[in-house]
């Protein structure tokens, strides 16, 4: 790639080159990242300036001959021209705000007529040329490309669409005559038409900025903004690959900085009590980096904010991380990257915080409104002390800003690897959506109109890769709202469709709202109420600061993952009191120890083998799915739609986290669309069935399979519960559908207790190296297995030494009830039968399988039933 000055010099020399005297020499400026919205913005801006313009139609056929582009072009209604186009040099502007701007020097040389063949590329071009001056003309071209069989099949139709519109084409009506859904390309080019010797690099930069300013009046500010981000990145990143992403604009400030994670109960349980952590308040501001660079003082946030200068003498750089209040130009620092030229990113937070206060004082010395956030180091695990610490931060009324949450910072890690968590009250959790008015006449039942309201659809942004891995589909009406060129990009809008509320993207906007015209805008919204298949949304504000971002075609509100993880705070509310006392309802929170490795691997192997039996099925329901321990197995099996049901909201929230973890870190051949339903399975089958059938897209005939791993003992309290379970399975399954249960076998447990003469309230134990590994406490006195209601206490690998009560499963009674409700027994098998297969699967793990492991495993079994 040449420098811009060298390219201009080469251009000027071309006119003195005798070998090029019959050639057309072209110097063009091209913008390579143009979508319909950007194209339309520039077009309408030029029309509004009443610049002289002409419209032309042409068909260019391009044939590759010895790596050269041989062209036949017909500018209607003229004759065909034959020429070859040869590039000589190019220069590409590196700043992201230039939209891939490239200066190209090329020559066109006349050639003989040639014959077209099936390899030809056909480009139909509808071009409007704006003569902005004697030196420059700006060409805006709508292009349709056809190749191979498309040429004969579609050429005539697209000639009509592009050239022979019902209404005569003018610059004022052109944008209304072209349908952006017809898979067009959009090109903006600037061609130099002045005297070659008069051209300078500065002229090129000036006209380039003229066009970019039409797209964004703040283009020059955006360029400075990206340069500031590059400066910050140069002190944070060491990888040239990552720095290149910053320079290209693929990464912005948000991707560069370590992100604060919305904290769930499951997150907190992993490090509760948070001894050693630092806490501070969450201000209702925006993330910003305060920088002293040479003589300039500025903040990089959603844009570049200049705060002043240091005077004539340049200072060594200082870079602080914090929250910024744009209206008051106030900065509140919570971390430091560099202080007076000393890079601090590899130090732990407990060390960096010492330099943070010094950096704040430097800003204050230049009359900048800056302050260090108040931090408390947590030193006690006592819940009462923790409560006082959290209250002193969250309920402090003397702060100069409103507080909407608490930040917890982990010590001991580098700047980029510091884990920072954010807790907010449910009410203060909001999401940013791109809002579009729902197209009319879609005839979609879920889009039913409501009197006094207008239906709008809520969208967020998603990468093409994540869209595929989550097996998402576009909602009805999507293609009417977004042109195909936007849909074909690597990052595009998608309806907000969280796993527990697939129709959360529906928003009924009141006709009486003070927010009148919201179509096409980014709104900050909060959830007021969650009902079956309906969410009541409230508008907090219009994000006016995001409207320019929309024009780039790369921003559509929150990212899908960020939006759904934030949404979890509505699904599983995390109270302020739980910060001190620890999260409530954390069933099976403990971790397994190493002594369970082989036995756990055996159980996992068996569940994997069972789930593989339902591979590639369309709809599968998991009863008691918990936090998704089997999610990876369903993904490996290629299940297309998975409905997970559980009454534990915290577990379901963890499942959603796992959904994204699998999508970003594991490779699966097939994608699975995951739905979760917060539901107590002991409630009436009719009510549960109705909720499942209301899941968007769930088939009327029912699911292919129902799976329940190690859960049904919760539903063996009485006969009514077992009957209810059988009825539920019958209502949810299609004819011929299968039920797959894994469970502890009640008859085998009773046999074990009898063999070891375990009486009421006594405990059977299996020890390993004097450590109790497995244990069952007898909580019933009957000598024979009852149909239901017999309790035992079980010591589980992850229960931290506590016994969990459950009911014995009388499998004969269970099968009897299911047969009564229209099922047939397909298979019943003990887990011990899988041990030989496990030996073949992993000889190394089998070798460390102990007798206690084998005894414990033999207590479990598998039951398969088919709906008649």
From Swiss-Prot:
Its EC number is 3.6.1.74, 2.7.7.50, 2.1.1.56. Part of the viral DNA-directed RNA polymerase that consists of 8 polII-like subunits (RPB1, RPB2, RPB3, RPB5, RPB6, RPB7, RPB9, RPB10), a capping enzyme and a termination factor. GO terms for cellular component: virion component. The keyword RNA-binding applies. In the N-terminal section; belongs to the dsDNA virus mRNA guanylyltransferase family. Induction: Expressed in the early phase of the viral replicative cycle. Its main location: virion. It holds the Pfam family mRNA_G-N7_MeTrfase. Pathway: mRNA processing; mRNA capping. The N-terminus contains the mRNA 5'-triphosphatase domain, the central part contains the mRNA guanylyltransferase, and C-terminus contains the methyltransferase domain. This is mRNA-capping enzyme. It comes from African swine fever virus (isolate Warthog/Namibia/Wart80/1980). It catalyses: a 5'-end triphospho-ribonucleoside in mRNA + H2O = a 5'-end diphospho-ribonucleoside in mRNA + phosphate + H(+); a 5'-end diphospho-ribonucleoside in mRNA + GTP + H(+) = a 5'-end (5'-triphosphoguanosine)-ribonucleoside in mRNA + diphosphate; a 5'-end (5'-triphosphoguanosine)-ribonucleoside in mRNA + S-adenosyl-L-methionine = a 5'-end (N(7)-methyl 5'-triphosphoguanosine)-ribonucleoside in mRNA + S-adenosyl-L-homocysteine. S-adenosyl-L-methionine binds at residues 607, 624, 646, 710-712. Keywords: Early protein, GTP-binding, Hydrolase, Methyltransferase, mRNA capping, mRNA processing, Nucleotide-binding, Nucleotidyltransferase, RNA-binding, S-adenosyl-L-methionine, Transferase, Virion. Residues 594-868 form the mRNA cap 0 methyltransferase domain. The keyword Ion transport does not apply. One of its GO terms (molecular function) is GTP binding. It is found in: Virion. The active site is at 282 (n6-gmp-lysine intermediate). The record marks 627, 658, 713, 806 as: mRNA cap binding. Probably catalyzes the second reaction in the mRNA cap formation pathway. Forms a covalent complex with GTP.
């Amino acid at each position: 790639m040449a420098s811009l000055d060298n390219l201009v010099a080469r251009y000027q020399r071309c006119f003195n080159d005798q070998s090029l005297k019959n050639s057309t020499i072209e110097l063009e400026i091209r913008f390579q990242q143009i979508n319909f919205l950007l194209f339309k913005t520039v077009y309408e801006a030029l029309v509004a300036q009443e610049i002289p313009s002409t419209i032309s139609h042409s068909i260019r056929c391009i044939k590759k001959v010895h790596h050269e582009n041989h062209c036949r072009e017909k500018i209607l209604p003229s004759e065909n021209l034959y020429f070859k186009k040869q590039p000589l040099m190019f220069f590409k502007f590196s700043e992201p705000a230039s939209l891939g701007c490239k200066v190209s020097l090329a020559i066109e040389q006349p050639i003989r007529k040639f014959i077209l063949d099936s390899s030809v590329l056909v480009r139909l071009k509808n071009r409007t040329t704006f003569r902005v001056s004697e030196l420059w003309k700006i060409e805006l071209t709508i292009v349709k490309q056809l190749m191979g069989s498309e040429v004969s099949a579609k050429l005539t139709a697209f000639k009509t669409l592009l050239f022979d519109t019902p209404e005569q084409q003018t610059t004022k009506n052109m944008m209304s005559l072209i349908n952006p859904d017809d898979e067009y390309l959009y090109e903006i080019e600037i061609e130099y038409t002045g005297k070659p010797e008069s051209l300078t690099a500065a002229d090129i930069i000036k006209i380039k900025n003229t066009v970019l300013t039409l797209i964004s009046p703040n283009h020059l500010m955006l360029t400075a903004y990206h340069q500031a981000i590059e400066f910050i990145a140069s002190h944070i990143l060491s990888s040239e690959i990552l720095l290149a992403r910053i320079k290209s604009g693929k990464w912005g400030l948000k991707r560069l900085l370590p992100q604060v994670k919305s904290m769930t109960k499951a997150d907190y349980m992993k490090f509760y009590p948070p001894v050693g952590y630092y806490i501070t308040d969450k201000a209702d501001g925006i993330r910003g980096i305060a920088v002293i660079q040479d003589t300039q003082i500025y903040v990089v946030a959603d844009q570049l904010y200049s705060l002043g200068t240091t005077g004539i003498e340049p200072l060594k750089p200082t870079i602080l991380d914090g929250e910024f209040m744009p209206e008051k130009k106030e900065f509140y620092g919570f971390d430091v990257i560099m202080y007076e030229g000393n890079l601090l990113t590899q130090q732990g937070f407990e060390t960096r915080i010492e330099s943070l206060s010094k950096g704040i004082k430097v800003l204050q010395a230049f009359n900048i409104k800056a302050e260090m956030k108040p931090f408390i180091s947590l030193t006690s695990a006592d819940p009462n002390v923790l409560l006082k610490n959290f209250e002193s931060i969250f309920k402090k009324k003397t702060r100069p800003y409103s507080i909407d949450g608490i930040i917890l910072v982990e010590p001991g890690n580098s700047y980029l690897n510091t884990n920072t968590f954010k807790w907010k009250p449910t009410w203060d959790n909001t999401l940013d959506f791109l809002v579009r008015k729902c197209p009319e006449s879609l005839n979609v039942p879920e889009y039913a109109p409501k009197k006094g309201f207008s239906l709008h659809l809520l969208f967020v942004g998603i990468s093409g890769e994540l869209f595929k891995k989550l097996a998402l589909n576009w909602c009805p009406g999507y293609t009417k709202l977004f042109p195909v060129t936007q849909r074909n990009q690597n990052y595009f809008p998608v309806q907000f469709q969280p796993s527990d509320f697939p129709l959360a993207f529906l928003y009924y906007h009141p006709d009486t709202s003070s927010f009148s015209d919201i179509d096409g805008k980014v709104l900050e919204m909060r959830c007021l109420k969650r009902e079956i298949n309906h969410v009541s949304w409230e508008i907090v504000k219009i994000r006016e600061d995001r409207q320019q971002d929309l024009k780039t075609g790369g921003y559509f509100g929150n990212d899908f993952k960020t939006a759904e993880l934030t949404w979890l705070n509505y699904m599983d509310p995390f109270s302020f009191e739980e910060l001190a006392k620890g999260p409530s309802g954390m069933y099976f929170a403990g971790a397994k120890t190493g002594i369970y490795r082989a036995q756990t691997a055996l159980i996992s192997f068996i569940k994997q083998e069972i789930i593989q039996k339902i591979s590639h099925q369309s709809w599968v329901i998991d009863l008691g799915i918990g936090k998704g321990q089997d999610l990876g197995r369903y993904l490996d099996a290629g299940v297309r739609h998975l409905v997970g049901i559980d009454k534990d909201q915290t577990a379901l929230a963890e499942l959603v986290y796992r959904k994204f973890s699998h999508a970003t870190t594991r490779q699966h051949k097939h994608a699975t669309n995951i739905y979760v339903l917060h539901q107590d399975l002991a409630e009436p089958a009719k009510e549960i069935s109705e909720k499942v059938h209301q899941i968007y897209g769930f088939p009327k005939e029912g699911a292919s399979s129902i799976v329940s791993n190690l859960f049904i003992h919760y539903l063996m309290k009485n006969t009514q519960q077992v009957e209810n379970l059988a009825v539920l399975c019958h209502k949810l399954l299609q004819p011929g559908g299968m039920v797959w249960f894994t469970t502890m076998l009640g008859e085998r447990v009773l046999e074990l207790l009898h063999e070891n003469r375990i009486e009421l309230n006594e405990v059977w134990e299996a020890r390993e190296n004097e450590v109790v590994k497995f244990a069952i406490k007898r909580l019933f006195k009957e000598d024979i297995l009852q149909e239901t209601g017999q309790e035992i206490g079980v010591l589980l690998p992850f229960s931290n030494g506590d016994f969990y009560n459950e009911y014995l499963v009388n499998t004969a009674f269970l099968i009897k009830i299911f047969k009564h409700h229209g099922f047939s027994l397909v298979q019943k098998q003990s887990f011990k039968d899988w041990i030989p297969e496990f030996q073949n699967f992993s000889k190394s793990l089998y070798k460390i399988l102990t007798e206690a492991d084998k005894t414990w495993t033999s207590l479990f079994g598998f039951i398969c039933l088919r709906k008649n």
